[in-house]
């Protein structure tokens, strides 16, 4: 995939995550703040947990930084897969954000 295609795909992913986080605040009373600067999305939860999702265009990866560690995801045409064999991006973010929110939340991509 070209860099332009990758950046467009990442933009859609970050928009979707941000929109879902806003929905959690409205429908599940999750205390969360979102901020976006270019291809960096930061989620801040009531307990002070920060989750940062950003793109690395040169590697064509999405990186996630959370209390539990740093994770890298590469797109295979259908899914964002952990480069170390862990859960796919939506599953990992669902778990990370659920722990920070104190209630189950789901990320769907």
UniProtKB/Swiss-Prot annotation:
Q: Which GO terms describe its cellular component?
A: cytosol
Supply the PROSITE patterns for this chain: FRATAXIN_1 (PS01344), FRATAXIN_2 (PS50810)
Keywords for this entry?
A: Iron, Metal-binding
Q: Which SUPFAM superfamilies match?
A: Frataxin/Nqo15-like (SSF55387)
Q: Which InterPro entries match?
A: CyaY, Frataxin/CyaY, Frataxin/CyaY_sf, Frataxin_CS
Iron as a keyword of this entry, yes or no, is yes
GO MF terms listed in the record are: ferric iron binding; ferrous iron binding
One GO BP annotation here? iron-sulfur cluster assembly
Keyword Nucleotide-binding set for record: no
**A matching Pfam family:** Frataxin_Cyay
Family the UniProt entry places it in? Belongs to the frataxin family.
Q: What does this protein do?
A: Involved in iron-sulfur (Fe-S) cluster assembly. May act as a regulator of Fe-S biogenesis.
Q: Which PANTHER family match?
A: FRATAXIN (PTHR16821), FRATAXIN, MITOCHONDRIAL (PTHR16821:SF2)
Tell me what this protein is called: Iron-sulfur cluster assembly protein CyaY
The organism that produces this protein has a lineage beginning with: Bacteria, Pseudomonadati, Pseudomonadota, Betaproteobacteria, Burkholderiales
């Amino acid at each position: 995939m070209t860099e332009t295609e990758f950046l467009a795909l990442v933009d859609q992913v970050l928009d979707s995550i941000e929109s879902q986080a806003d929905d959690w605040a409205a429908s599940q009373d999750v205390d969360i703040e979102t901020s976006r600067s270019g291809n960096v999305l930061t989620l801040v939860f009531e307990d002070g947990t920060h989750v940062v999702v950003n793109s690395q265009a040169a590697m064509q990866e999405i990186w996630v930084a959370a209390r539990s560690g740093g994770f890298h995801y590469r797109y295979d045409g259908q899914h964002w897969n952990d480069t170390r064999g862990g859960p796919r991006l939506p599953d990992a973010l669902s778990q990370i954000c659920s722990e920070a929110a104190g209630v189950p939340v789901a990320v769907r991509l």
